[in-house]
Amino acid sequence: MSSPSVAVARQVPSASRPVPLSWILLLALLVHGPLLLMQLPNSSYDANLHKFFASHYAQHWFDPWNQKQFTGFSQTTYPPMEQQWVALFSHLIGLNLAYMLVQFIAILLLPVGVFRYARIWVDERAASYAAIGSVLLGSLAFLVYNAGQLSTTWAAPLYLIALPYYYEWARESRFSSLLKGVVLICAAASAHHVTLIFASFIFALPVVAMAIMDRKRDDADASVGGVVMRTLIFLALSAAGVAIVLYPFWRVLLANPIKQMPIPHASRSNYFLQWTLAMNYLIVPWGALLLGLPYIFVKGLKEARLRPLFLGFWVAMLFALGGSTPVPKWVLGRAFEVLTYERFVLLANVMALPILGLMAADLMDRFGRKAAFTLGSLAALTCAFAVAWPVYYQNHDQDFSVQEVVQFLNRDGHDKFRYITLGFGSHKFDEVSTYTTASSVDGDYNSARLLPEMTQYGSGQLTNSKYFGVNGMESLRAILKHADQYGLKFIFVHDRYYEPLLAFAGWREQEVYDRGAVTLWVKDGIPPARPTAYQESMRPTRMEGLMWGTLPIGSSILAMVLIFLLPDKRQRAEHYEFPVAAHEPVLREAR
């Protein structure tokens, strides 16, 4: 006869336990991995711009001077870290897959950052739900698959990972946390300067408030003065590190502050006056998270511990609404006309996730699997709709081949002259720039341009001239008038709207490509291109090129080394009461 056994009592429901971070990263792989392998981000708005920058680093790592756009410009006008990683990986897997890999790393970093950031305010279970939500955010899918804002999706997670190290340093005076936090801040700044400026307030100030509030919590025993002093030390070291790592960027910015006429952008409009803007900048990136706004406001204002987080969310939300409210313009002044505001949706969503993690925990405690299924379905639909949105709201014209254009420019010495494209859109224009050896008068990164024909009219790229109305066409006419000065001999046209202007200005059609989709217009008597005085004065020195090729990417490598060599202190385990049966265990024989 076998020995007696004890009947098993009820177990702690799995829904009441935190979800392991490894499972959340697996979810990110399952959701975004196939989409990235399909290379869906390739068609996003800014993807080719990042690949254009990366292709230059792949060939000229220590020389950030790029001749291919604006008759020559310095890539020190844009922080380079993620583009340098794309350049490195491109030698192994090609440019397109390298972009996908670097974007995937950013996607994996986001739930890690959200989990660490949320733990400052909520327990491990709610933080794990917040991390799950970050994988399925509509704003993340919008920035990855529609806007192509690789820099924002890289910088934001790095700040989220860095700030908990500041929190530990300020409360516990742990030097390893200070070191890792400062290096991560430098790495985040090397990914994006705009996120640096705004994350310093939106993400960081609530954490500073919590460091003061929690100065006696757990094992910490700090004073208000001590927290403030350590905050100033962290701030000073971070500022010094960012100043050194991005020195070439700051030098160019101070030597050439942005004074050009503002360029219109839809994100500065009032979203509530046009349904397409409301869909593109409000409904799609926010998705089902809009349904949680009442809970965020009530919970965030009710609980003192959540108020700093809520205030950060509220500020980010006001900026995410762009020109729908006057607040961003009041705060930023003229700088309002320089920024675009779709990126602030991600910042606002991230600030809301810890509170929504509490909501998810409450709902699952009440309704169990029904709540889990409903929340999961809403999050999945939000992500799916944002991924599919470019199919219904295209941000560039129908695809066409530019291979013959590139081949023409790269043969028979044609790259001695400059060219522009008309009707290509910035996406295709950047593709041409990436693979040709010729230089263009046009360019895509607006902050890098210095030519007066482009800075004085308040229009964007020449290839999109007609979409900027009178200002855009006047800018194009000014460039055509000075074709001799710039060595502008070739114009590739994908929109017949421009052909009467070209014919009137003395250009003639010479060749046809891609079964008539593209025509080549040339002008006789144009001398070969030569350097322009506007651009050569901004050329980086060799020392700046050396700094640019080592410090930004070096900060990210150093951060990885420090995190590996100085592992985080293990958090105290959260205890669960062992479930005890209400009656004596039943003894029975096992047969």
Which sequence ranges carry the predicted segments?
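Active-site lumenal/periplasmic loops and adjacent helix-entry segments of GT-C-fold
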Residues: 18-23, 29-160, 164-165, 187-188, ...
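Membrane-interface helix-loop junctions at the exits of transmembrane helices
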Residues: 30-39, 60, 129-145, 241-260, ...
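Transmembrane catalytic cores of multi-pass membrane glycosyltransferases
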Residues: 43-46, 188-297, 301-307, 322-328
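Specific aromatic-rich, kink-prone transmembrane helix
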Residues: 51, 55, 154-171, 183-184, ...
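Membrane-helix boundary/interfacial segments in multi-pass membrane proteins
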Residues: 70-72, 141-154, 258-280, 310-359, ...
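Extracytoplasmic
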Residues: 112, 116, 174, 278, ...
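Membrane-interface transmembrane helices that cradle and orient dolichyl/undecaprenyl
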Residues: 160-180, 188, 213, 217
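Hydrophobic, aromatic-rich transmembrane alpha-helices
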Residues: 284-314, 318, 362, 557-571
